[in-house]
Structures are given as C-alpha cells and as structure tokens.
C-alpha cells in the first residue's frame, strides 16, 4: 500500500498548517485513520529514520505521542531540551539547524517563540515540525480533524464552536477547519480575540473551501446547533501571572456547562486539547460526561502524527 506517497509531501515542514493544502491535509487524516485501524501494516515504513525532539516546554501528549509514534513506524527518537544543547548557551539557531541536519532526518520542536521555529526551518535541510509555539499548535489540529472525521465521516459542513481564549490551539484549529470546509463559530471576550492576521488567512481559506467563520462575544450564539464544542484552558503556560484577571474576564459566561451545551445538537461531542482545569473552562459534568470524546481526541495525536511523519519522511 502506497497511500502515504499519494502527494509529494516528502521533506515538507509543518509549521502552521499553511504550508499544506486541503488535499494534503485530508490525505493525512485518512492515512491516520488507516494507521489506527491496521497499525501492523505500517510498523516498518520508517525503519532507519531518526526524529530529533527538542523541548523548551513541559509536555505529556506531544512527547509521548511523537516518541511512541516514530517507534511504532520502525524509526527512533532522540529527546533533548535546549538546556542540553549548545543553543541553550548561545549557539546561533543557524548553526544548530545545519549540524542537526547532518545527523537526523527530522526535528520536532516545542517552544515558546514561533519565530524560533521559523528560523530553524529556514536554515535546516530536514523537515521541521512545530510541536507547539505561542502562535500555533498544528499537530493538535490534525488530531482534532481526525476525531471529527471519525465521528462524522466527513469534514465539510460540520459545525464546530470554539469557546474561550483565542490562543495557539484556537489559531491552528481555525486554520485547519477553514482549509477543509468546517463551519467554525468562535466566542471569546474582548481582549482575547484570535490574531487578526491569522483570522484573515482563515477567512480566505474558508472562501476557497466553502466553510464559514463567525466570531462573536456570545457563547450561546456560537454553540447553536453545533456538532462539536471545543474549549481550552483560560491560562496557558507562561501566563500564570495573569491567572486571576483571566478567570475574572472569562467567568461563568464562557464556561462550557450544561446550560451552554443545551443549545448544541442533541448528539454533539465535546473536545478539549488537555490538560483541562475542571470547573473553570468546563465543568466536570461535561468533560467527564457521555458527550465528551477527549480521550479519543488525545489518542489521535499518536495516529495523526504517525501519518504526518510518514508523509514527510519518504516512507518505504
């Protein structure tokens, strides 16, 4: 089976999803589903490949899913932090990128500044995967799309409501959804909107795909007839000093609770990228309830990233 070679995606970076088109993204999702269904078929396709993983931020899902993923495809992983590399002592990113390109086949980096990832990709001769930055979290968006596809057997025309902070997760979800034709409703208070440049790019993608984007401060309006309701923490890593203000600004109005979800479709599903703060952005009743698919969603990080690795590393 050569499904992973359908598009010429070998060597491509995954920085913000904008490097990819709708067909390529859809193929990644379908390949991920195939890998989940029949993992043994793909167990040696990346034999001899080495993935370097650099972490500047703590990680559970990103680290374990990428490390397990490359191993399950027959490859290997080397896990590092910037503190363990010369880059942590002032070596230019340019030098690190060129040297790492001599040793390994791809780099996944989880860091703070998106500019750092872009600079690494500019100088590297190997694919760079963004494992999370302050602006984007594309690998999470791949898992989100896969989860939606598994439940609906399609992406176009699905209605998704995102309630909360216009953060990196929201940015990538917005771009991915717009690219594949999902109707996205965003609800967030003033001061927590998505980046204007990213929103403009998403709106352009939606015009091409037939998707719709609607932005409001009213979460009840956003969830009306929604197929999926998505939220994330109100305070991300590095924003701990703002926690009290953020809790006050979001308040009960933006909490995903029984009253809010009553406006969605009866068979709606709840999504959260995790980790979650129960009784803040979502009640335990909802996140632990029958409509929640958060563990399936988290599990799909593994399969979506395996498909991504196969696509960019010239799988055998």
UniProtKB/Swiss-Prot annotation:
The keyword Transferase applies. This is Ornithine carbamoyltransferase. SUPFAM superfamilies: Aspartate/ornithine carbamoyltransferase. Reversibly catalyzes the transfer of the carbamoyl group from carbamoyl phosphate (CP) to the N(epsilon) atom of ornithine (ORN) to produce L-citrulline. NCBIfam families: orni_carb_tr, PRK00779.1. Belongs to the aspartate/ornithine carbamoyltransferase superfamily. OTCase family. Its EC number is 2.1.3.3. Carbamoyl phosphate binds at residues 59-62, 86, 110, 137-140, 273-274, 301. Keywords: Amino-acid biosynthesis, Arginine biosynthesis, Cytoplasm, Transferase. It is found in: Cytoplasm. One of its GO terms (biological process) is citrulline biosynthetic process. One of its GO terms (cellular component) is cytoplasm. It is an enzyme of class 2 (transferase). Pfam families: OTCace, OTCace_N. HAMAP family: OTCase. It catalyses: carbamoyl phosphate + L-ornithine = L-citrulline + phosphate + H(+). It comes from Listeria monocytogenes serotype 4b (strain F2365). Pathway: Amino-acid biosynthesis; L-arginine biosynthesis; L-arginine from L-ornithine and carbamoyl phosphate: step 1/3.
């Amino acid at each position: 089976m050569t499904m992973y070679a359908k598009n010429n995606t070998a060597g491509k970076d995954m920085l913000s999803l904008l490097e990819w088109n709708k067909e390529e993204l859809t193929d990644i999702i379908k390949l991920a589903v195939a890998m989940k269904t029949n993992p043994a078929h793909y167990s040696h396709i990346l034999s001899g490949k080495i993935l370097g993983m650099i972490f500047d931020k703590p990680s559970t899902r990103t680290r374990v899913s990428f490390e397990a993923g490359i191993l399950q495809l027959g490859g290997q992983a080397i896990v590092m932090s910037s503190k363990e590399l010369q880059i942590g002592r002032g070596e230019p990113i340019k030098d690190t990128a060129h040297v790492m390109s001599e040793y390994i086949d791809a780099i996944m980096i989880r860091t703070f500044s998106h500019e750092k990832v872009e600079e690494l990709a500019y100088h590297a001769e190997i694919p760079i995967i963004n494992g999370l930055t302050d602006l984007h979290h594309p690998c999470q968006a791949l898992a989100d799309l896969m989860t939606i596809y598994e439940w609906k057997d399609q992406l176009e025309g699905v209605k998704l409501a995102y309630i909360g902070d216009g953060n990196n997760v929201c940015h990538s979800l917005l771009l991915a959804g717009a690219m594949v034709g999902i109707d996205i409703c965003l609800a967030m208070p003033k001061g927590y909107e998505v980046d204007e440049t990213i929103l403009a790019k998403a709106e352009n993608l939606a015009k091409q795909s037939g998707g719709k984007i609607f932005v409001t401060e009213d979460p009840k309006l956003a969830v009306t007839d929604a197929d999926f309701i998505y939220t994330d923490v109100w305070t991300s890593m590095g924003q701990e000093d703002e926690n009290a203000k953020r809790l006050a600004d979001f308040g009960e109005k933006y909490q995903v609770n029984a009253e809010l979800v009553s406006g969605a479709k009866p068979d709606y599903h709840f999504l959260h990228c995790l980790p979650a703060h129960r009784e803040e952005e979502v009640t335990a009743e909802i996140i632990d309830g029958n409509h929640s698919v958060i563990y399936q969603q988290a599990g799909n990080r593994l399969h979506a990233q395996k498909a991504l690795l196969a696509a960019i590393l010239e799988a055998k």
